[in-house]
UniProtKB/Swiss-Prot annotation:
Pfam families on file: Glyco_hydro_9
Protein name: Endoglucanase 11
Enzyme class: hydrolase
Family: Belongs to the glycosyl hydrolase 9 (cellulase E) family.
Single GO biological process annotation from the record: cell wall organization
Molecular-function annotations in GO: cellulase activity
Active site annotation, chain numbering: 92 (nucleophile), 427, 479, 488
Signal peptide: 1-31
UniProt source species: Arabidopsis thaliana
Length: 525
């Protein structure tokens, strides 16, 4: 760089700085307030940190959540298989395969859509680590083409105890699906997770990407050939993660992601030819979750319409689009006949009482992704009650995120560790008991209930980045450890936020660039 160019850049920077300071002084507000008032970069960083707190297994040297230690090091030993690793789903220590796989799918989708934004913030490596921690476990759990270990631990015995994961004395028995005990739902979701992750690692780790794709294809074939609900084969899961929607949505979901990962017409034909039989065109949804994937399938399928090579499938894809539009319009309060999603008085989407925030985060993600799709296509969303522009869709998603971060009647951030006020008694065994690093003495099964569970004091460790269940239908929130309906957090709550935060960071940067250009133009005049 020449001295002249260097001085020119310095002068330009000082000019912009002076204009920005002068403008902010006139307005009486900070530039942060101008673009929304929330630090989405901080929220993104903290959301990714949460997954490190949920890790099971031997923790790596670069573990950032230092109040955790190794746990579950004999998982699978009883069955003669290595099942060390993976994630605890929430505030307990069972490793439930179905919600874990959905978590990884959503993390991968976030990176696929907003990887550049994640890279610009320095968080891409953490996102990749979060995904790989899950997919490494899935590789272990898929021990042969038609066998998938679906769960480690028993929810009943696990919930009887209140212990740190480092002290676990509960059963670590593992449960599998196979040809005689099918589980098309968990096989399909795990296939989706590994297919989506294969896209993520395609350029940076092609060998690993190929390995993931191989497992994904085998799992999908297994799930499709030997059909059945996993909670019918494994009764132990029924009280915790029952597959209420069945397995049809997961088969379509897995095929859709395999098509995105391979561009193989076989999977495209499956999504089209099986659309009616598997309910893809009959179910008009108002939720998207670890159990119900139809809205995700419908949205992904509708996005294929813009590609000329899918012209032969346009009739079925258009039907998928109609169902995707129904979901989006229901979220935006633009449907008729009472099919809109309920909202709290302050405007939060409200699907059901237990862990409602999971539906808010997934809805915000789908709105965000589809708004970008419509913007690129230069089209709007057509609903029964009017047209919605891409900017309006993204704006509503942002309103939900801002509610989560503190713009709500309780003035509470429901993302733990973000902002001046957030839940301090999260329903989480590890965080609610003194850290193993500071208190190495063994804490027994019921000792945790006796000495820690009922305390009114804040948790000794902050579960940074966890999205708790959230407020009730009146925007009220009771921060008690025993109020697990509202204060328990889950990995699949936070995972979709990663993509939305990344997109909102882009939005902020765009606004700042536009303001800079406008201010410079005004100054020159």
């Amino acid at each position: 760089m020449t001295v002249m160019n260097h001085r020119h850049k310095q002068c330009h920077f000082l000019l912009l700085l002076l204009i920005t300071v002068f403008s902010a002084a006139l307005d009486g507000v900070s530039s942060e307030t101008d673009v929304g008032g929330f630090d989405y970069g901080e929220a993104l960083s903290k959301s990714l940190l949460y997954f490190e707190a949920q890790r099971s297994g031997r923790l790596p040297y670069n573990q950032r959540v230092t109040w955790r230690d190794h746990s579950g090091l004999t998982d699978g030993l009883e069955q003669g298989v290595d099942l060390v690793g993976g994630y605890h789903d929430a505030g307990d220590h069972v490793k439930f395969g179905l919600p874990m796989a959905f978590t990884v799918t959503m993390l991968s989708w976030s990176v696929i859509e907003y990887g550049d934004s994640l890279a610009s913030t320095g968080e891409l490596s953490h996102a990749l680590e979060a995904i790989k921690w899950g997919t490494d476990y899935f590789i272990k759990a898929h021990t042969s083409p038609n066998v998938l270990w679906a769960e480690v631990g028993d929810g009943d015995t696990d919930h009887y105890c209140w212990q740190r994961p480092e002290d676990m004395t509960t059963s670590r028995r593992a449960f599998k699906i196979d040809e005689n005990n099918p589980g098309s739902d968990i096989a399909g979701e795990t296939a989706a997770a590994m297919a989506a992750a294969s896209i993520v690692f395609r350029s940076t780790n092609p060998h690993y990407s190929h390995l993931l794709l191989h497992h994904a294809q085998q799992l999908f074939e297994f799930g499709d050939k030997y059909r059945g609900k996993y909670d019918e084969s494994l009764k132990v899961v029924k009280s915790y993660y029952a597959s209420v929607s069945g397995y049809m949505d997961e088969l379509l979901w897995g095929a859709t992601w395999l098509y995105r990962a391979t561009d193989n017409e076989h999977y495209m034909s499956y999504v089209v030819d099986m659309a009616h039989q598997l309910g893809g065109l009959s179910w008009a949804m108002s939720e998207f979750s670890w159990d119900v994937k139809f809205a995700g399938v419908q949205l992904l399928a509708s996005m294929l319409l813009k590609e000329e090579k899918h012209k032969q499938h346009s009739k079925v894809l258009q039907q998928y689009k109609s169902k995707a539009d129904h979901y989006l319009c229901s979220i935006l309060n633009k449907n008729i006949n009472g099919t809109n999603v309920q909202r709290t008085p302050a405007g939060l989407l409200y699907v059901r009482q237990w862990n409602n925030m999971q539906y808010v985060s997934t809805a915000s993600f789908l709105l965000t992704v589809y708004s970008d799709h419509l913007r690129k296509s230069n089209t709007d969303l057509e609903c029964h009650e009017g047209t919605v522009t891409p900017d309006e869709m993204l704006g509503f998603a942002k309103s939900q995120i801002d509610y989560i971060l503190g713009s709500n009647p309780m003035e509470t951030s429901y993302l733990v560790g973000y902002g001046p006020k957030y839940p301090i008694r999260v329903h989480h065994r590890g965080a609610s008991i003194a850290s193993f690093k500071e208190h190495k003495g063994f804490i027994g099964c019921t000792q945790g209930y006796d000495n820690w569970y009922g305390r009114s004091e804040p948790n000794p460790s902050v579960l940074v980045g966890a999205l708790v269940g959230g407020p009730d239908h009146q925007d009220d929130f009771d921060d008690r450890r025993g109020n697990y309906v509202q204060t328990e957090a889950c990995t699949y709550n936070t995972a979709p936020l990663v993509g939305v935060f990344a997109r909102l960071i882009e939005l902020e940067e765009q606004k700042l660039e536009e303001e800079d250009v406008s201010l410079v133009a005004t100054y020159k005049r």
